[in-house]
């Protein structure tokens, strides 16, 4: 990956949206590698749009009206979003490096920038409005008046720390009274009764913006004066290249393409404090030019307290969707770590009951604090009453779970890889014991398990030892932090699991 930027004088930004026009966009989304089909199914289900899976793994493309941008940002399976300017499925690169780079420069003025920039501008305005709404309702009436012992208002950091400690001690019974410590990632909505209202408001905002004369592009920041907003936009070009038959590097492509963008728009380049990020994605002979719609990955939406191996929320969603949760299902993550899987499950499948557990007290504490943050997201706007989530966390031993035999519908967990946590040697004893205990608590015939591991050899051996309890139904190959891992979907057989001594 490479980025390029340059300097330029003032110039025009993207033009206004035409009044009454129905603006459409082709959206590109990066998704966890291996879960492209899962993401496509979510897009079809929630947006009614068919998706095309890119030959470059980890990307999908779909067309939506621009007014649907709020729903696009609420997709659970996507990491980053961008609007496609143009796509070339079989771009012919010149063998000579100078000629190939010159072609990329000449490409800039031939691209249809107008509508994608309108979509970018609309996306920017929606982010600003959402930020203003969140700031306006970030504190409950009760917490606004709360003072400390010295008569002065408590600082936000101190309030947040106390709230998290209280919530971690009693997740089920304590309501967090403090204000929201971090803003939600753009486009996200809490899973409570107010979500529909917020969605309606965002839809109206989007429709108004599409139909309004919004003027030239503005800078994505708060406290900007009208004079500052009228200044030239700042930009950078990011090049992602894959393939060994190119005569140029990613840096060279980004540099020359960025120079042409700068000359075409007369924008000013800034590598860090930019308004527009132009994407140049090259995969062998496939070239896609786009404009980024997300500033940071949406996979960070749920976690505020990270552990050594925190699972991405988007990958957690893909694992949960793989096991097809049904209403009233009991879903257990026996090695929850920071709680990424059960928190994602509670947010997206609130009609199920989720149980998280871990043998490490620090992991349990992190999970409890992350649940506390989720409760604050769900806090009612007009009172300090928090809406609960169908989720509990407990410290336990994975090989001796305090759950009744056959009482669980689904087990979903990220097993120790033996890299940062545990060891490859310990996995040879841990994996078979885990599978046996998971088989005991799962309902015979209908129970499912979705397990992520990079220690594939050890898992295959362990599964062969418990083949009378678990049957492998599907394997999804994924990339986790550069490691080639696998997600296994197992189905519980009708075979009765070995009973053990009662826990009580």
For the regions a language model picked out, list residue spans one by one:
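Hydrophobic residues embedded in beta-strands of well-ordered beta-sheets
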Residues: 60, 286-287
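Short, charged/polar, Gly/Pro-enriched secondary-structure boundary elements
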Residues: 67-74, 296-299, 496-498
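Conserved S-adenosyl-L-methionine
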Residues: 311-405, 410
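S-adenosylmethionine
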Residues: 363, 370-480, 484-486
């Amino acid at each position: 990956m490479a980025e390029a930027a340059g300097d330029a004088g003032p110039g025009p930004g993207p033009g206004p949206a035409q009044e009454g026009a129905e603006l459409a966009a082709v959206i590109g989304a990066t998704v966890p590698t291996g879960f492209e089909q899962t993401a496509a199914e979510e897009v079809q289900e929630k947006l009614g749009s068919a998706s095309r899976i890119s030959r470059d793994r980890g990307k999908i493309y779909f067309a939506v009206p621009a007014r649907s941008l709020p729903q696009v940002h609420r997709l659970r399976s996507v990491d980053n979003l961008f609007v496609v300017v143009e796509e070339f499925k079989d771009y012919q690169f010149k063998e000579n490096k100078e000629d190939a780079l010159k072609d990329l420069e000449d490409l800039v003025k031939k691209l249809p920038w107008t509508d994608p920039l309108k979509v970018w501008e609309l996306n920017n305005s929606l982010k600003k409005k959402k930020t203003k709404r969140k700031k306006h309702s970030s504190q409950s009436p009760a917490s606004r008046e709360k003072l400390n012992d010295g008569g002065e208002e408590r600082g936000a950091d101190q309030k947040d720390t106390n709230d998290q400690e209280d919530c971690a001690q009693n997740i089920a019974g304590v309501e967090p009274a403090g204000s929201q410590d971090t803003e939600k990632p753009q486009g996200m909505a809490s899973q409570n009764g107010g979500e529909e209202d917020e969605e309606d408001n965002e839809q109206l905002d989007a429709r108004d913006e599409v139909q309004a004369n919004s003027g030239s592009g503005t800078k994505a920041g708060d406290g900007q004066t009208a004079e500052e907003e009228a200044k030239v936009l700042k930009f950078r070009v990011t090049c992602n290249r894959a393939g060994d038959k190119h005569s140029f590097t990613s840096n060279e492509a980004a540099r020359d393409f960025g120079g042409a963008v700068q000359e075409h728009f007369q924008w000013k380049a800034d590598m860090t404090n930019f308004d527009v990020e132009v994407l140049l994605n090259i995969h062998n002979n496939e070239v896609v030019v786009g404009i980024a719609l997300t500033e940071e990955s949406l996979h960070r939406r749920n976690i505020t307290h990270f552990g050594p191996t925190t699972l991405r929320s988007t990958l957690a969603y893909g694992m949960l969707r793989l096991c097809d949760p049904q209403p009233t299902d009991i879903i257990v993550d026996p090695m929850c770590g920071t709680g990424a899987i059960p928190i994602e499950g509670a947010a997206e499948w609130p009609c199920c009951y989720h149980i998280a557990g871990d043998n490490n007290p620090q992991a349990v504490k992190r999970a409890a604090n992350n649940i506390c943050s989720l409760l604050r997201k769900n806090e009612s706007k007009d009172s300090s009453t928090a809406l609960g989530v169908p989720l509990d966390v407990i410290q336990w031993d994975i090989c001796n779970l305090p759950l009744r035999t056959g009482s669980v519908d689904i087990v979903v967990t990220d097993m120790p890889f033996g890299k940062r946590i545990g060891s490859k040697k310990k996995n040879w004893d841990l994996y078979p014991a885990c599978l046996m205990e998971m088989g005991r608590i799962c309902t015979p015939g209908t129970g499912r398990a979705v397990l992520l591991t990079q220690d594939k050899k050890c898992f295959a051996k362990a599964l062969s030892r418990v083949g009378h309890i678990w049957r492998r139904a599907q394997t999804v190959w994924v990339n986790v932090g550069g490691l080639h891992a696998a997600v296994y979907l197992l189905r519980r057989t009708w075979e009765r699991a070995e009973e053990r001594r009662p826990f009580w």
